[in-house]
A protein has these predicted regions:
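Short gly/ser-rich loop at a beta-strand->alpha-helix junction or flexible surface loop bordering the NTP-binding
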Residues: 1-163, 179, 277-279
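Surface segments flanking catalytic/ligand-binding clefts of nucleic-acid enzymes
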Residues: 7-11, 15-17, 55, 96, ...
Length: 279
């Protein structure tokens, strides 16, 4: 994949002519180009936005999460910067915000908010459910400790969004391996069920690993998995799922398999019917 670059710098260095720039590349932000066949990612947008800022902005929010290794980030979202330009082009969101030196790291020469500061920004600037899914993915990728994020919550006590940030951070679980796993866990918790443990291994009587549940209430031997399209289209995974379901049923587990076709109310009924008590 072609990396974003500053058009005038490419011409000045002799890397390409003005004609080649116009004919072979496309501007994604003013003055910032990529080769025409480039499939933009969230990481590429983040770098392009940083270049647009004359390399002065601090990459933040979703863009920081992308550079820090988070999965499941759609390329179509605007890049996010902490930067003093209040009139960014389409595709970039800027905000003027205070950021301490210990809240910034450097990745490939770019200033990026640390995992803890990124988690705080996501928690205070997005709706709770969306923030939880984003921070789940960030925590899964970076192993950021919520205690470190809480220190920043205390640092910025009284700032806008801190109250909702506390709500989101209390619901985060780094064990979620997809946004829909986050959704399923939040659905269960909000329905009044105890918070499940995530990524729970289950072994047979010989100690052989049968599989790993997305989440489980081990005291009542109830587990839930969210099964996306890959569970159906990947034949090897499909076969593993069948084997796991048959084996754990024989071990007296209740295994709840959830797909995009399931209604929320029905999922809640299935969890309750399986014997998970409400708190």
């Amino acid at each position: 994949m072609g990396e974003p670059f500053v058009g005038t710098e490419a011409i000045a260095s002799g890397r390409m002519t003005a004609y080649q720039l116009r004919s072979r590349c496309v501007a994604i932000y003013p003055g910032i180009y990529v080769p025409r066949d480039t499939a933009l990612t969230a990481k590429a947008r983040a770098k392009a936005a940083w270049l647009w800022s004359d390399r002065r902005g601090v990459i933040a929010g979703r863009s920081a999460a992308a550079l820090l290794g988070s999965k499941w980030l759609e390329a179509g979202h605007p890049a996010e910067l902490i930067h003093d330009n209040r009139r960014p082009p389409n595709g970039i969101r800027t905000r003027i915000d205070h950021v301490e030196d210990d809240e910034v790291t450097v990745l490939s020469g770019m200033r990026v908010t640390t995992p803890a500061r990124t988690a705080l920004d996501l928690a205070r600037r997005y709706p709770v459910d969306e923030a939880v899914a984003l921070i789940d993915a960030l925590a899964n990728a970076t192993h950021v400790k919520m205690a470190d994020v809480e220190l920043l919550v205390d640092r910025y006590r009284g700032r806008r969004g801190i109250k909702s940030a506390r709500t989101a951070l209390d619901l985060v679980d780094a064990g979620a391996e997809s946004p829909r796993e986050s959704w399923l866990r939040l659905l269960a918790v909000r329905a009044g069920f105890p918070r499940p443990r995530t990524q729970v291994p289950v072994h047979d009587e010989y100690g052989v690993l049968v599989g790993v549940f997305d989440m489980a209430w081990e005291d009542v031997k109830v587990a839930a998995d969210y099964e996306g399209d890959q569970h159906r289209t990947d034949r090897r995974r499909f076969n593993r799922d069948i084997h796991k379901a048959e084996t754990v049923t024989g071990m007296r587990w209740t295994h709840i398999r959830v797909t995009s076709m399931d209604r929320e109310a029905d999922v809640i009924k299935r969890i309750a019917a399986a014997g998970v008590p409400r708190t």
